[in-house]
């Protein structure tokens, strides 16, 4: 199963790490996109998560998509 996050702030990162620690999903099967590409790469690459440029790419990659953005 592949899980994608639209938005990868503190809550999304906590969920992603918990899924990997709990052995529910392998790190390579987690992908995310966010507004700040540099920050996204800093928060994904060291952990083996995949970084995407946009929400459409995340949706194409994932079986499950989590929308983790603030409701501005």
Predicted region positions:
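N-terminal Rossmann-like NAD(P) cofactor-binding module of classical short-chain dehydrogenase/reductase
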Residues: 65-66
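Glycine-rich, N-terminal phosphate-binding loop of Rossmann-like dinucleotide-binding domains
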Residues: 69
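Active-site beta-alpha loop architecture of Rossmann-like, nucleotide-cofactor-dependent enzymes
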Residues: 72
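NAD(P)+-binding Rossmann beta1-loop-alpha1 motif at the extreme N-terminus of oxidoreductases
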Residues: 1-56, 60
């Amino acid at each position: 199963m592949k899980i994608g996050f639209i938005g990868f702030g503190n809550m999304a990162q906590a969920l992603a790490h918990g899924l990997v620690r709990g052995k529910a999903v392998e790190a390579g099967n987690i992908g995310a996109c966010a507004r700040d590409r540099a920050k996204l790469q800093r928060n994904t690459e060291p952990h083996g998560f995949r970084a995407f440029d946009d929400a459409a790419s995340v949706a194409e990659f994932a079986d499950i998509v989590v929308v983790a953005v603030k409701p501005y």
